[in-house]
C-alpha cells in the first residue's frame, strides 16, 4: 500500500535526545516549583495538581508535597500525564520569553517540509505532552514547523510500547494502518506499531540497526513510496 501519512517520534528521531534531557528537563525542574506556587489557584493548573494527588494516592497533599512528588517523577523519568502537562506549561512560558528554542535536526526539518509539499499528512506521537510537541516544532531553531503537521498524539492515546495505542492513532488519523509510516529510534515502539499494522522505519542517529526494522541514520536517507 502507498504511504499516505507519516507518524514520527521526536526524541532521538526528529530531535536530539540531549535537547530533552540536557535542556528541557533541567529547565522544567528549575522553574516548575515556582510556576506551580504562582499558578496553583488557576483552574488549568489546579486540575493537574489534583491529577498528581490521584496518581500518587495522596489526596490531601498540599502544594509543596505535590511539588516534591513532581520533582521525584522528573528524577525517575516518569511518563505521568499531569507531569508532562505541567512541564509543557513551564516550557511554553520559556518559549514565549525566548529562553528556549526547539531542536530539530536540519535533515528532519527539510524532509518534513518536502513530504508536506508532496501531499503527505504528518503526525507526531511522543511521550511529551501535545502542548510540548507543538512548542518544539512551533518555536524551533528551523523556524515555525507547526503548520506542517495535521495532528499530535501523546500518552493520552496510550503507552508507546503497546500496539493498541497505534491502532487507536490509526483510527484517529482515518487511514488504514498499512498506509501510515511510523518513525522511531526505539525498537519496542517500532514493534508495537508493526503489530498494529503500521509500516515502520527505525532512525539510528549514531548508526547501527534497530532489530527487525529497516533503519536509516538520517531523514535524508528516507525514501517514501
Swiss-Prot record:
Name of the gene encoding the protein in the UniProt record: mtnC
Q: What's the name of the protein?
A: Enolase-phosphatase E1
Cofactor notes: Binds 1 Mg(2+) ion per subunit.
Record's family? Belongs to the HAD-like hydrolase superfamily. MasA/MtnC family.
Query: What is the annotated role of this protein in its UniProt record?
Result: Bifunctional enzyme that catalyzes the enolization of 2,3-diketo-5-methylthiopentyl-1-phosphate (DK-MTP-1-P) into the intermediate 2-hydroxy-3-keto-5-methylthiopentenyl-1-phosphate (HK-MTPenyl-1-P), which is then dephosphorylated to form the acireductone 1,2-dihydroxy-3-keto-5-methylthiopentene (DHK-MTPene).
Q: What class of enzyme is it?
A: hydrolase
What is the protein's quaternary organization? Monomer.
Which terms in the Gene Ontology molecular function aspect does this entry carry?
A: 2,3-diketo-5-methylthiopentyl-1-phosphate enolase activity; 2-hydroxy-3-keto-5-methylthiopentenyl-1-phosphate phosphatase activity; acireductone synthase activity; magnesium ion binding
In terms of NCBIfam families, this protein maps to:
enolase-ppase (TIGR01691)
Keywords, alphabetical: Amino-acid biosynthesis, Hydrolase, Magnesium, Metal-binding, Methionine biosynthesis
The Gene Ontology biological process annotation of the record reads: L-methionine salvage from methylthioadenosine
Instruction: Tell me its cofactors.
Output: Mg(2+)
Q: Which InterPro entries match?
A: Enolase-ppase_E1 (IPR023943), HAD-like_sf (IPR036412), HAD-SF_hydro_IA (IPR006439), HAD_sf (IPR023214)
Top-rank lineage group of the source organism? Bacteria
SUPFAM superfamilies from the xrefs? Answer: HAD-like (SSF56784)
Q: Which PANTHER family match?
A: ENOLASE-PHOSPHATASE E1
Recorded catalytic reaction(s): these are: 5-methylsulfanyl-2,3-dioxopentyl phosphate + H2O = 1,2-dihydroxy-5-(methylsulfanyl)pent-1-en-3-one + phosphate
- Its Enzyme Commission number(s) read 3.1.3.77
Specify the taxonomic lineage: Bacteria, Pseudomonadati, Pseudomonadota, Gammaproteobacteria, Pseudomonadales
What pathway annotation does it carry?
Amino-acid biosynthesis; L-methionine biosynthesis via salvage pathway; L-methionine from S-methyl-5-thio-alpha-D-ribose 1-phosphate: step 3/6; Amino-acid biosynthesis; L-methionine biosynthesis via salvage pathway; L-methionine from S-methyl-5-thio-alpha-D-ribose 1-phosphate: step 4/6
